[in-house]
Amino acid sequence: MKLLNNCIVAAVALLLCAAPSGDACTSIMVGKKASTDGSVMTAHCCDSYYRTFVTIEPRKTLSPGETEPYFFNVLHKEEPWDTRGVHETGRIVPPALQTYRFVNTAYPCMNEKQLAIGETTFDGNRDLLNRNGVFWIEELERLALQYCDNARDAIRLMGEMAEKYGYADWGECLTVADPNEVWQFEINGPGPGEPGAIWAAQRIPDDHVGISANISRIGAIDFNDPDHFMYCKDLKKKAKALGFYRKGRDKLDSTDGRKWKVYSKQHLQYLSYQRFQTIQTA
């Protein structure tokens, strides 16, 4: 028994060493026909060194012409009033003058309309990183929860605003759910030059369960299926410029990990373990 316990401790230690803190989050998506009571779900474990307090942000009424600030590093605050390391990245013209009430955590997670969001980082290709953008991923979530009441509108708004004002973070996945459906939204920076964003989203079928554990999960994007896929403006053009797309195809295949991130064998083993453990406990 002592030997077995030592082996378990050693295995856990190896797994902890194998993944950096930013690569230890797992998100789960459940369609309404895959749950026992018809509920749509998104669940998210945030395994890193982020803020632990929760606040309920009230509704706000903005004045015509008023702009809204967005920030860097709010997820590391120790208290609601803590501003150390936090700075404004830019201001946007809000899409509406009235906001919804929402639950604010390290990664804002749900609003009063039952729009819910989970998060997991997949890093992405370094060549796509562009720090000149306004939005970091947690602030993009805040934007959606403030102004949207369903998953599709949330994805459209996050995508359009990221393209317009710029996305500054690493490759990220957001699992976006409402009472009817759940989607997986993946976003990268546009590369060097002008701020922008490259993104796509795929709907999880109603009778399916999806798992995203720190690796890009959207494989082929079907441009002829708008009920299951959404994507950024000029995606084909951008993908072609990056060498990710071949002319004449109706699908963009992003399953080649070299396009988005070079994963080490050790890292891939850890990510596979995350997904395996999730399936085992389902």
Predicted regions and their residues:
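Bacterial N-terminal signal peptides that target proteins for export
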Residues: 1-9
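Bacterial N-terminal signal peptides
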Residues: 9-18
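Sec/Tat signal peptide C-region and signal peptidase I cleavage site
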Residues: 20-24
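A contiguous strand-loop segment
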Residues: 25-137, 157-282
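Short, well-ordered beta-strand elements within core beta-sheets of diverse protein domains
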Residues: 141-147
